[in-house]
Amino acid sequence: MTVFKQIIDGLIDCEKVFENENFIAIKDRFPQAPVHLLIIPKKPIPRFQDIPGDEMILMAEAGKIVQELAAEFGIADGYRVVINNGAEGGQAVFHLHIHLLGGRPLGAIA
């Protein structure tokens, strides 16, 4: 069971900022920016690459949540959205999650 599944199940404390039927959003415990949130689907999908085609609509819902949280946290004018896919992509927890980072200039990714 991943740490995110344990958070979703209420077994591990977190600083929750959003929850609905399909997603939970929490503050990252090791933030890389003044605002660093994780948007996590409740369904245990290991990687972005593993989302079934007929469930890709979840990503549209996640995008709307990102927009709402960016506005709520005052970063709507500039933020970064990141999904690490697989070990080679830097994914450390194999439960799909989206990083929302902002609150300072983040610079370009070359």
Swiss-Prot record:
Residues 3-110 form the HIT domain. The lineage of its organism: Bacteria, Pseudomonadati, Chlamydiota, Chlamydiia, Chlamydiales. PROSITE patterns: HIT_1 (PS00892), HIT_2 (PS51084). A motif (Histidine triad motif) lies at residues 95-99. Gene3D superfamilies: HIT-like. SUPFAM superfamilies: HIT-like (SSF54197). This is HIT-like protein CPn_0488/CP_0266/CPj0488/CpB0508. GO terms for molecular function: catalytic activity.
